């Protein structure tokens, strides 16, 4: 299943990794472009999950259209106070 995970915080990153290990094609969306680039470069969410590798098969992007286009499921893992910005 093609899944978009909106929100690259602790919960969003954890869900993306678990969904990937359960055989799904996952795209992880991060609001801040600079942090998305850091996640791509390091493949570790140093702010929320230091030491936990993000598998290279998980696509990381800050482009919400790229993240949600042609997906079977969209997971919303954004804190409620930031929902308006999504």
Predicted regions and their residues:
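Rossmann-like NAD(P)-binding element
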Residues: 52-86
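NAD(P)+-binding Rossmann beta1-loop-alpha1 motif at the extreme N-terminus of oxidoreductases
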Residues: 1-52, 59-62
């Amino acid at each position: 299943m093609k899944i978009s995970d909106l929100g690259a915080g602790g919960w969003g990153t954890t869900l993306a990794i678990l969904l990937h290990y359960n055989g799904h094609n996952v795209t992880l969306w991060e609001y801040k472009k600079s942090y998305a680039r850091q996640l791509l470069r390091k493949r570790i969410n140093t702010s929320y999950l230091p030491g936990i590798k993000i598998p290279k098969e998980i696509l990381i992007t800050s482009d919400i259209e790229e993240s949600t286009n042609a997906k079977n499921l969209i997971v919303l893992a954004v804190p409620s106070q930031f929902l308006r910005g999504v």
